[in-house]
């Protein structure tokens, strides 16, 4: 059930019940387990544009966090007989274990077109009533759908205590590894893995970390992770980052971390019409005159007239990033 009144019927996937969230679409053909467990999807109902999901199953190694953060899951067809030597369970079982309500068998191409043309919008998945046969229940649910908003997202997904990780490779004998402070705004496990594989010692910090707490660690660099929600909502985090940038510690932001860094430096952000979510997003570096295919997951962008370095080459989507 979409906020604009459109109703799409399908078959229950995962748990029974009703869930409300912001409906978005992701264009990846693979990586569905990473998508589901990515904290950046907090509060959202994910639509997979690729028609068959779950064909290589789910496993305990590919999770980007300890749970599913999305509010719901929409697929054209969920595979019930996955085939892969690493597979441990089906998509349906994984959703049920995490208490997630999903739906399959709907026209995901049609839904994606709606979101592309109208922009992402709120919606609901329900197994509790037929909205066409019971209009009074639909009328009661619609105000809840329309009023839904993703708020307090960073506070919900960040860690509560610092966590330390040792390098797994890349450190010569007798050398001290670089120490990276990683501000957890909704951090994916793979960011930590990539840093450790490159010889870094990583300290993951809560989003509320202050300048004094950062200085006490004396890191060689600061990384700000991905994360969910409206970047402008995180007023205190932005103020803390501004103080951190003034120290001269080399800093690098990914996704929400990039947006918060931009806000701390005086730039502005905006909500995109339907965002970039998938592993096939083109980005042009005008200085190098090269286009790269990138993996992205964000619904907000830094306004180009305040801080432009890279932009999408697509004439239909000139969102700055």
Residues covered by each model-derived region:
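Active-site environment of divalent metal-dependent phosphoester hydrolases
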Residues: 189, 301-303
């Amino acid at each position: 059930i979409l906020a604009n009144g459109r109703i799409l019927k399908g078959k229950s996937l995962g748990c029974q019940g009703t869930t409300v969230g912001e409906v978005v679409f992701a264009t990846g053909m693979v990586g569905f387990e990473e998508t589901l467990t990515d904290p950046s999807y907090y509060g959202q109902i994910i639509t997979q544009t690729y028609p068959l999901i779950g064909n290589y199953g789910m496993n305990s190694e590919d999770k980007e966090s300890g749970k599913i953060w999305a509010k719901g899951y929409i697929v054209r067809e969920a595979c019930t007989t996955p085939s892969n030597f690493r597979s441990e369970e089906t998509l349906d079982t994984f959703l049920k274990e995490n208490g997630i309500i999903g739906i399959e068998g709907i026209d995901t191409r049609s839904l994606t077109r709606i979101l592309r043309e109208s922009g992402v919008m709120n919606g609901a998945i329900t197994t509790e009533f037929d909205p066409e046969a019971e209009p009074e229940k639909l009328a009661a649910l619609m105000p809840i759908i329309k009023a839904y908003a993703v708020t307090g997202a960073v506070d919900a997904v960040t860690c509560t205590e610092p966590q330390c990780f040792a390098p797994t490779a890349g450190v010569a004998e007798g050398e001290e590894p670089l120490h990276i402070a990683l501000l957890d705004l909704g951090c994916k496990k793979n960011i930590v893995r990539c840093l450790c594989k490159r010889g870094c010692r990583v300290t993951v910090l809560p989003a509320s970390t202050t300048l004094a707490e950062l200085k006490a660690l004396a890191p060689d660099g600061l990384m700000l992770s991905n994360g969910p929600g409206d970047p402008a909502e995180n007023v205190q985090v932005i103020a803390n980052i501004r103080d951190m940038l003034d120290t001269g510690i080399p800093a690098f932001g990914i996704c929400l971390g990039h947006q918060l860094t931009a806000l701390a430096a005086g730039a502005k952000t905006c909500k995109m019409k339907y965002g970039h979510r998938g592993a096939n997003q083109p980005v042009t570096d005008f200085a190098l005159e090269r286009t790269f295919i990138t993996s992205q997951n964000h619904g907000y962008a830094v306004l180009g007239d305040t801080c432009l370095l890279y932009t999408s080459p697509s004439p239909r989507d000139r969102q700055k990033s």
